[in-house]
Curated annotation (Swiss-Prot):
Cofactor note: Binds 1 Mg(2+) ion per subunit.
Keyword set, alphabetical order: Magnesium, Metal-binding, Thiamine biosynthesis, Transferase
Family matches, as HAMAP family: TMP_synthase
CDD domains in alphabetical order: TMP_TenI (cd00564)
Protein name: Thiamine-phosphate synthase
Residues engaged in binding Mg(2+): D70, D89
GO BP annotation list: thiamine biosynthetic process; thiamine diphosphate biosynthetic process
Organism whose genome encodes this protein: Salmonella typhimurium (strain LT2 / SGSC1412 / ATCC 700720)
The organism's place on the tree of life at top rank: Bacteria
Residues involved in 4-amino-2-methyl-5-(diphosphooxymethyl)pyrimidine binding: Q37, L38, R39, I40, K41, N69, S108, K137
């Protein structure tokens, strides 16, 4: 039963790019994307605050679901749509503050044990990864593959889910066929020969999500 302690999100968030700059946020929102995450790693809050402010403003302008990865204090301060946290961030984050601010929460998972941890937090959605090998970030866990992803989806039933990790344009239909609500992509867009074409094709497959 989907009863999060945080505001709900649609079961289908649609195409969900994860990018590291305001420039990419603006490009992709202009191209029709309506769910997106700003993920800037390993900087102090004061170093990223201007980017967080700009990204949130763009999200509002385009009526988009803009998630801030990790910088939850800034997300609360500037009223982002939501926050996304990794497993390692859950213990050091004031989840009640995020909840009280009315922000949505997404949590990363890599196996059944981490899904248990995520479910205990009752987030708005659960991210499942990494599905395929990925060069975007160093991963201590092994790729889960489609069969394991489908097993997680069956377990989570009506919980909004996002698949992430090595999802290319070619692999996207098979990933969505597992029943996962959304697909997060990184290099499939940012490293594409033609990012506009890649974005349009991925939007045609994954959509923009439910209202």
């Amino acid at each position: 039963m989907y009863q999060p302690d945080f505001p709900t999100v649609p079961f289908r968030l649609g195409l969900y790019p994860v990018v590291d700059s305001v420039e990419w946020i603006e490009r992709l929102l202009e191209s029709g994307v309506r769910t997106i995450q700003l993920r800037i790693k390993d900087k102090r809050d004061e170093e990223v605050e201007a980017d967080v402010i700009a990204a949130i403003a763009l999200g509002r302008r385009y009526n988009a679901r803009l998630f801030i990865n990790d910088y939850w204090r800034l997300a609360i301060k500037h009223r982002a749509y939501g926050v996304h946290l990794g497993q390692e961030d859950l213990e050091t984050t004031d989840l009640k503050a995020i909840q009280a601010a009315g922000l949505r929460l997404g949590v990363s998972t890599h196996d059944d044990m981490e899904i248990d941890v995520a479910l205990a937090a009752k987030p708005s959605y659960i991210a499942l990864g990494h599905v395929f090998p990925t060069q975007t970030k160093q991963m201590p866990s092994a790729p889960q593959g489609l069969a394991q992803l489908a097993s997680h989806i069956e377990r989570l039933a009506d919980y909004p889910t996002v698949a992430i990790g090595g999802i290319s344009l070619e692999r996207a239909p098979a990933v969505l066929a597992t029943g996962v609500g959304s697909i997060a992509v990184v290099s499939a867009i940012t490293q594409a020969a033609d990012w506009r074409e890649a974005t349009a094709e991925l939007l045609a497959i994954a959509g923009v999500g439910d209202e």
